A protein has these predicted regions:
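Charge-rich, low-complexity intrinsically disordered regions
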Residues: 2-133
């Protein structure tokens, strides 16, 4: 796959993605699987991952990093983990901000129903699209 550290011309990017239908003005266009995967990975790479947390909940990744098979938790998450559906926890998760941005959680937190806001975010908040900062 192409080196994505460069900003390609749109013509070159269309070739890399095997983008079909765009130039004809179609509403529905097609890209090859590798091209779509590349776009997804570039998107995912923009978000900081809590590497310690990711390694703790994915012992296979931790083992692979320790053996040198994978360089980092972020590399794994971007290249495979996200596409496999592995859980995401941001490196910059802020419990105070999470509670302020999601006031509906306050009562459940005070009642002890949500003892750990980070766990709540990972298990349901992320899928619900809740903001954390």
């Amino acid at each position: 796959m192409a080196d994505m550290d460069l900003l390609f011309s749109f013509e070159r990017l269309k070739e890399i993605l095997d983008l079909r239908g765009y130039d004809k003005g179609y509403e529905d266009v097609a890209v090859n699987r590798a091209g779509l995967t590349l776009l997804i990975q570039q998107y995912v790479a923009r978000f900081p991952l809590d590497e310690d947390w990711y390694r703790a909940v994915n012992p296979d990744v931790d083992d692979a990093i320790r053996s040198g098979a994978i360089a980092s938790a972020t590399e794994h998450f971007v290249s495979q983990g996200y596409l496999e559906g592995r859980a995401y926890c941001p490196a910059d998760f802020d419990e105070t901000a999470y509670l302020e941005l999601n006031p509906d959680l306050r009562a459940a937190r005070e009642d002890g129903m949500i003892p750990d806001l980070r766990v709540h975010f990972v298990r349901s908040g992320h899928a619900e699209g809740r903001r954390y900062k």
